[in-house]
Amino acid sequence: MDKYHYTFSLPKKIQISPMIKVGVAGSGNLEVIIKPNSDFDKTEIIVNTVISGFRNTWDAVIERFVEDYPYSGLSITLNDAGATPPVVSLRLRQAMETYQTGYPKKDSYTEANARNRIYSLVDEASFTEFLLDKETPSPTLPQLNMQVETDDGVIIGTAKMDGIDIAIASQQKDFIGGSVGEIHGAKINGLIKYAIKNQLPAIIFLIDSGGVRLQEANVGEIEISEIIRSILDTRSAGIKTIGVICGNNGAFGGMGIISGTLDYLIVNQGARIGVSGAEVIQAVKGVEVFDSSNRPLVWRVYGGRTRFLKADVQGYTTNKTMDIRQAIKTALKTLPTAPSLNLNSILAEHEQLQKRIASAKNCREEGEWLKNNRTELYQQDIFNVSDQQFLALTNKGK
């Protein structure tokens, strides 16, 4: 791990703005943090990189940056995980634009990062990020010579959704696959406890994770169990719990289990929910049991449409951020305010599971089940129609 420190006296002044963070400290990428410097006459740049021996390259990249942005009074930190010079330059430009104008809203949910998703979904200027000015990196990753991220891959805070106070957590999809480590899990658990203590009406979880972080497996599993316990406390307190699973990682492993404890789940066509992924099953049991390269099969087993058809989830939407926002608003209006976790609700869930097991018989995936039980949907090629056609055919729109 190399560290480079640069100090410049630059001619231009820039309006002081709150701290911003752009990019992800994932493989081939980097995190850029910009905040006001204590010395308004100087700009300081610190580079932390896992790739050694490229001081001259960094010197050239930083020199070009200060030529393009000769502003004093900034403190800039780069946490690099092997980004190429063009990527570094791009992230620095994006960070400067964000520092000056704020986080941009994104139309595509999957393309947005964790912060952009929050800012694109919640009411304008309503989000307050917790621990923004605090560094909360993993204590384990540096021991493995892996780059840390200052927020450990999850953004938490409070906001308003259609005027309703909410707590919200958003997983950073590109930081080790949105995986749950010690700090990552503790932040989610702390947010849940905050919502209970302050009696917030709802918690929104923007889930995009492959599950527990393998590098922190034991503490990650503990965090999953603590989050589940806190969610059950939340539901018993009458706080609505809503999960949005519309990202490329889906919800697998411990996060897949957590998703099953929430009141209301929203998915799109690209979503996947499971415990063990197709690649894991193939590695353990062989390709004859599960061919992970058969992508249509993978989505018929784990996919958002399958989960919606099986009533595992309550809301189906598109990849557009505004459609997902509308789905969240619908969930907030649909869910009752009374506590949702009681004996009757548990018995009803068990009854539904028994019916599902009985109807499954020897079917191995949803396509087979539809062919035997819902021929009208099977004949319409339900997995390949548009989102609008899918909702119309399933009679579960809005």
Where does each model-flagged region fall?
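Short Pro/Gly-enriched beta-strand edge/turn motifs at strand-loop
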Residues: 11-17, 134-144
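Conserved mixed alpha/beta catalytic, RNA-binding, or beta-rich assembly cores of soluble enzyme
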Residues: 15-17, 22-31, 44-47, 51, ...
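Glycine-rich anion/phosphate-binding loops
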Residues: 55-57, 148-153, 178-193
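N-terminal short beta-loop-beta anion/metal-coordinating cradle
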Residues: 145-162
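Amphipathic alpha-helical segments at domain termini/boundaries
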Residues: 101-136, 283-398
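N-terminal intrinsically disordered, cationic/polar leader segments
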Residues: 1-103
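Conserved catalytic cores of soluble enzyme domains
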Residues: 210-341
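A structural preference for short, pocket-lining loop segments at secondary-structure junctions
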Residues: 161-172, 186-213
